[in-house]
A protein has these predicted regions:
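Membrane-interface elements of multi-pass transporters and channels
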Residues: 44-48, 72-80, 98, 110, ...
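Membrane-embedded catalytic scaffold of the fatty acid hydroxylase/desaturase
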Residues: 57-176, 241-326
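Active-site-proximal flexible loops/turns
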Residues: 38, 77-78, 225, 237, ...
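Membrane-proximal N-terminal segments immediately preceding the first transmembrane helix
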Residues: 2-15
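Membrane-proximal, cysteine-centered motifs at transmembrane boundaries in secretory-pathway
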Residues: 17-18, 280
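Transmembrane alpha-helix/helix-exit interface in multi-pass inner-membrane proteins
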Residues: 158, 222-239
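Alpha-helical bilayer-embedded segments of polytopic membrane proteins, i.e.
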Residues: 19-65, 92-97, 150-162, 177-225
């Protein structure tokens, strides 16, 4: 019996992979409540400064809704793929304007090949460099950005939401998505409602201010949540011989658990547990951590967990270390 088979047996015996309909019903209603609050504030407040605060709040709400799309893509919510896909299409395409099909393909490629050059799309993000060879291959403006990427990282992720929207549109134009027509209609509906409401309720320049703040916060929040997961962790050689268990554990970083952290990070602070068992419901990750952390210690498998602040220090330190190859 392989180590992962042994671990999966323990996780199954504890019922941690069982679906959690009550929990996800609560999360869906909570997020819809957040969204409704933001929309009501948009309709009743006639003050650009207060609407700027609302734009920040809505950036937070969009990311929280995005976590639901992430969970549905991993089949955490329902047993059947179709039901999960329907949730993903609604929260992804309709509510936040990001293609569920694009995200599903992109994210599954990452899960199957974490921190592997040419295979993991998360380490092929222009204009950053995640390993030495990648840094040395940069030219022109991207080389300049990589040279100072430790300083540019957080300003760059302000555009993370915009980047995902552009990728979504390109995906639907160029690829035969399973739900291509449905996705296209829902995406068009999102932008029609989003832009229509803002420009009709706020007017020209105020709507543009709201959009700029809203999308920047959406990108910053989302990028900050995803950053600690793997950035600065070991990059694997293309011919590595690691089994599934070791590959997923040593390339991931956990952030120390706390109810507030769990909420803010949408459960992604349990990145090791999530990568080992992607379909494990979000509210069972903390319980799974107790099992998996103990299992890794027993079998001398490196298990990296740190604080929120230290995780960002490690990430920026890694970016500075990679950029040193250009400074040299």
């Amino acid at each position: 019996m392989s180590q992962f088979t042994e671990l999966r047996k323990i996780i199954n015996q504890k019922g941690l992979l069982n679906k959690q309909p009550a929990y996800y019903t609560y999360k869906i209603l909570l997020n819809l409540g957040f969204l409704a609050t933001g929309l009501i504030l948009l309709m009743v407040i006639d003050n650009i400064w207060l609407q700027s605060v609302n734009a920040v709040f809505m950036g937070f709400v969009f990311t929280q809704i995005g976590f639901m799309g992430h969970d549905s893509g991993h089949r955490q919510i329902f047993h059947g793929a179709r039901k999960n896909d329907m949730i993903g299409l609604i929260v992804g395409n309709l509510l936040i304007g990001i293609s569920y099909g694009w995200w599903y393909d992109y994210h599954n490629a990452h899960h199957g090949n974490p921190n592997q050059p040419d295979l993991d799309p998360d380490i092929k993000i222009a204009p950053l460099a995640f390993y030495e060879e990648q840094a040395r291959g940069k030219r022109g403006l991207t080389r300049f950005i990589v040279k100072y990427q430790g300083y540019f990282y957080f300003p760059l992720i302000l555009f993370e939401g915009l980047s995902k929207r552009v990728s979504s549109i390109r995906y639907l134009l160029m690829k035969q998505s399973r739900y291509r027509m449905v996705e296209s209609v829902l995406l068009l509906a999102h932008y029609s409602i989003y832009l229509g409401l803002l420009f009709s309720l706020l007017g020209g320049w105020q709507a543009l201010v709201f959009i700029a703040i809203n999308q920047a916060i959406f990108g910053l929040y989302m990028g900050s949540v995803f950053a600690p997961n793997h950035k600065g962790m070991p990059i694997l050689e293309s011919d590595h011989k690691l089994d599934y268990l070791h590959m997923q554990v040593i390339t991931a970083r956990n952030i120390t658990a706390h109810p507030i952290t769990d909420f803010i990070y949408g459960g992604l602070n349990y990145q090791i547990e999530h990568h080992l068992f992607p379909s494990l419901p979000r509210n069972k990750l903390r319980e799974a951590q107790e099992v998996i952390k103990s299992f890794c210690q027993k079998h001398s498998i490196s298990y990296h967990e740190t604080s929120v602040l230290q995780s960002y220090r490690e990430i920026l330190g890694h970016f500075h270390e990679i950029s040193a190859f250009i400074h040299d």
